């Protein structure tokens, strides 16, 4: 069983070593290890022999030393794990058996520290060499899962196969030294170090590995105060615990790292151990990136990680830098992580199908909704007040390195304030790994160029590492900084967003004056209030509640009720319902149910207000005169006075009892068209009758012999040739019973004419004295005898008959007459055009 486990672990080690070699060959920093193949073969044999010897030595409880590994700046690599993160699940990189043994000895990052103990104790040197191999391949495999490094990032890795160890140069590629160090056993400890960023700008930190740990190693709290200087090393030569640099947010990284024992070979590949490997990997992912604050540290803000592990009994330091340490100092070891290490929490690390350009080119404009209320809301001064030093430290996005346009990130919208948007969309997290600080045009703003021509625009995003300074300088009073507009959004959500983004985000001048901001804010507010805008607000407060004449319920001025800029609901005038007399039932009950209501009946009903005597006017409502005169306009634009409907007036009137008159024999037409009680209106109706001869004739036909008859056959012939024979016979019958006293009738008519003219104009009644052609055409008649002006212009026969002609009463003849009128009208227009 042990042999089977060894063969499996051997096979896994070889495959992992091959994968790590392929990933290392792609980097620019590790291109120089290929020439040293002899040392690689020697190291392979030494590590395999050391494995066999270690199993015998561990059971005897031999003392193990603590070799110190010196690590230069370990640059993280972006491999296929970033494109397909499922590889990190299929192949765990924190497992003990995944340790490759084929690490080339010429790799630059990890070297055996040379000292006086190298030749004295070969076991200790073998442990150091094997642990060097372990850390190198672990670093290549583990860092590839989480790192998304940029090729623009500066590297502190030495180009020659040398490594600084506490200020000394260690030559590990010498064939004599590598030959002298023959391995006899491997280290039983295969711990994984936390990924904490350590600043190694000038000095290189040392890494001490505990060689005999059998338990879970927890990160203790730092035992030294946090140092924010970028040049501080993670471990000093005089202190065993060292001092690490904590992050600005104060969040330590509590990583739990599983260490397996080589003596228990049967449980190495057991399900529990596999679960512990995956859990440790997940803990590295989840705990290392606890919040967005831990990602907001810049490249100069590092996090110090600490390892504490138990050693075997009698463990002692392995080099001269730890000879001074006591037994308690041996319990703690300081781990060094890559300097430019970065955990990408953006969407491309969780979803392999999402590409970088699709994720970062969208812009969220939902925070522009209330941008018109405050000055700082639309002036866009969220991060434009960063000084020149923060701008020089702000990395340029690698995707827009040439176009220098900033990119928004979905995960950074939590930095928006409630009603405020920043001047720049926050750049994506992957852009912080590129530190292109050699941009000479970063602070040079060409004020005359187009804001959308972003080829020479520099990119300024959020400087996450400088959180306290950013918060202090972020007040809306710091508006005199240089403003760089972001690029236009790739996706326009509505038809107003293009104009809105030009007004808010792209001024032609880079100034942020108060007047310009006020103008832009006013323009944005106007755009938001348009009816086609999706940002239109309907809850505008009423400025003055008492002044309801100027504003309605929505605060819209009533002077422009139907303007396109304001809603027209609630500002319409109330509709006045008017019931015309022709559509009303008669006031008095009619004996003839088949009576036709026409304009003649309107005439009879219009006379009702004037039947009152002087005493009857006292009973009227005082508001009657004002309510009867309704000022309206006809379709030609003329102003006319209209009275209210007749039933409303009749309810307010008290009609006095009038003198009854005898019915005439020839009153058949009047009895058939009007109500039976109409004749009770007798004298007052005749006294206010209109003055036209046709209506005089009708009054003579209808009423008593007090008024002489004027409808002689000669008068009928002169006034209308188309009079019915029936009407002529009626006129003859009535003339037999009435005396021919025309002089008395003319005097009475002249006196009534003047009274009727004044009363009709004062009350605003329509005239019924026009000819039948004008009444049929609904035109104003000039009432000229024998032909009015309209009939003479159209060359039509003018009819002033007392009763309706057949082309008015008969519908078929009426239609024919209307067609004739149309033809005559066209002919008259042609003649008028010819005269012009």
From Swiss-Prot:
Post-translational modification note: Phosphorylated by RIM11 and MCK1.
Effect of residue 523 to S: Impairs SIN3-binding and gene repression activity
Superkingdom classification of source: Eukaryota
Bias (Basic and acidic residues) ranges: 1-14, 117-126
Keywords attached to this entry: Activator, Chromatin regulator, DNA-binding, Metal-binding, Nucleus, Phosphoprotein, Repressor, Transcription, Transcription regulation, Zinc
Residue positions where Phosphoserine is found in the record: 114, 141, 150, 228, 316, 318, 645
Effect recorded for residue 524 to T: Impairs gene repression activity
Stretches for region SIN3-binding: 508-594
Biased amino acid composition, Basic residues: 718-739
Gene Ontology CC, one term: nucleus
Keyword Protein biosynthesis set for record: no
Xref: Pfam families: Zn_clus
Locations listed in the record: Nucleus
Gene3D superfamilies assigned to the protein according to its UniProt record, in alphabetical order: Zn(2)-C6 fungal-type DNA-binding domain
UniProt keyword annotation of Repressor present: yes
InterPro entries in the record: Zn2-C6_fun-type_DNA-bd_sf, Zn2Cys6_DnaBD
Composition bias, Low complexity: 226-236, 273-305, 381-398, 426-446, 680-702, 740-751
Subunit (UniProt): Component of the RPD3C(L) complex composed of at least ASH1, CTI6, DEP1, PHO23, RPD3, RXT2, RXT3, SAP30, SDS3, SIN3, UME1 and UME6. Interacts with RIM11, MCK1 and IME1.
Protein name: Transcriptional regulatory protein UME6
Biological classification of the source: Eukaryota, Fungi, Dikarya, Ascomycota, Saccharomycotina
